[in-house]
């Protein structure tokens, strides 16, 4: 516990209003003196409880819920009533509850957002209010916001356009910043940009709470986002802004436009890439191989897949390959087949990842012929197969067996969310590779039994990366998020892998260790920020102290009353 946490907190609120403030409410844990000082007598049951007793009651209530969506709603109700208790409950049951507060359950919560809505959290900034964004940001009661997660809800997980229902993603993401990375909830703000929706189910739903209008696009959309960004810079000039679940047509252009203007990153592109590279580095370390020796095939060539590919290329270059050599080891497959330079429908960010058709002459096929996944596996002979397609079953038995036929221990990463859209299940992959494959998934899966072996499955979850990045940026007071900082995060994650440190277990650490992993990543990110001149240089001791000082624990502080 930090020295700050030991000191009393001076609070200007009292009575029912204090009980209605999630950041300050202690519920039945207010002491006798606090109940007197803050006019709470008679507003709470007589018995004074510890946070341990409150947590035990909350967990017993949680276990009465019948479905995962019910559990999600229950946890969110606690969060909206008492944030300290909410995060204490998560701290004690993180592995069990992470799939409830975030993927996969949060996807259903987004779909049902208007039906399960209870109370306000975060900011809803709609296109008709575009001239009042500064006023909207001023209405936020948190003056010291350090991390904002923003979405326009156009590409929520693998579920597509969810309108304002996408707010569930920033709320869930920021919950993980706190639960995994120790960022105080007082420093976080979820935001949804309501630019309409093209989802007919929402437009025709009488309960839909968002702006009932088709999505704004083009110049109008870009101007609206820019109004928001400029207002954010005026309100919180040192904030870390995370873009979340923007469609690929907007995700990369927005990142490119603003990455040098304020401290921001896109978790779908850069966070996903960092955790994927960290996983790949861990697998290479465990096998005694170099990353630069691997050949990687992707299924799914959207912004997320291409972002991972670009970071793998950068990592290969750090091991001595030149850029052209590294790019020849990356094969991107989408619904049209292998991306090649003779295709006319490539997106801007796909061009650099397209293979030269002239180099594939031995593969057969004529100019313009599509090269399907199985043909790519047979000819490219990859050692790594990564799925970011959102299409269930694309990693067929034939594909996986072909992969295994030329690589004894391939790394297979079906990363699509939610579980219903995964390219293949771990059980299938391990059955088809005689238990030899290393597997990391995007959604959580239970350990797999293969013969007499019980094999743990690593969840290649961005939660291993983004909380540590946030903590490192805040502790170092970094003014940008760079590719070097993301690579430092990936390397730090790889060094925490059980198969690297112990020679056994999953490719990634257990979620129960994620808070310590986040601290290690924060140190690496902060040091890299200093090395690149994006943060003031300090000694290791000062940096470590800053990380510990910014690491929040869900514990109640004593309150003292003060006037406004």
UniProtKB/Swiss-Prot annotation:
Entry superkingdom: Bacteria
Catalytic residues, chain numbering: 102 (proton donor), 173 (proton acceptor)
Keyword annotations of the record: Metal-binding, NAD, Oxidoreductase
Pfam families: malic, Malic_M
Enzyme Commission (EC) number: 1.1.1.38
Binding site for NAD(+): 155, 268, 417
Keyword Transport: no
Cofactor note: Divalent metal cations. Prefers magnesium or manganese.
Gene Ontology BP, a term: malate metabolic process
GO function terms (MF aspect): malate dehydrogenase (decarboxylating) (NAD+) activity; metal ion binding; NAD binding; oxaloacetate decarboxylase activity
Catalytic activity, as annotated: (S)-malate + NAD(+) = pyruvate + CO2 + NADH; oxaloacetate + H(+) = pyruvate + CO2
Site (Important for activity): 268
Catalytic EC class: oxidoreductase
Listed Gene3D superfamilies: Malic enzyme, N-terminal domain (3.40.50.10380), NAD(P)-binding Rossmann-like Domain (3.40.50.720)
A single GO cellular-component term on record: cytosol
Cofactors, names only: Mg(2+); Mn(2+)
Family per similarity comment: Belongs to the malic enzymes family.
Name of the protein in question: NAD-dependent malic enzyme
Species per Swiss-Prot/TrEMBL record: Pseudomonas aeruginosa (strain UCBPP-PA14)
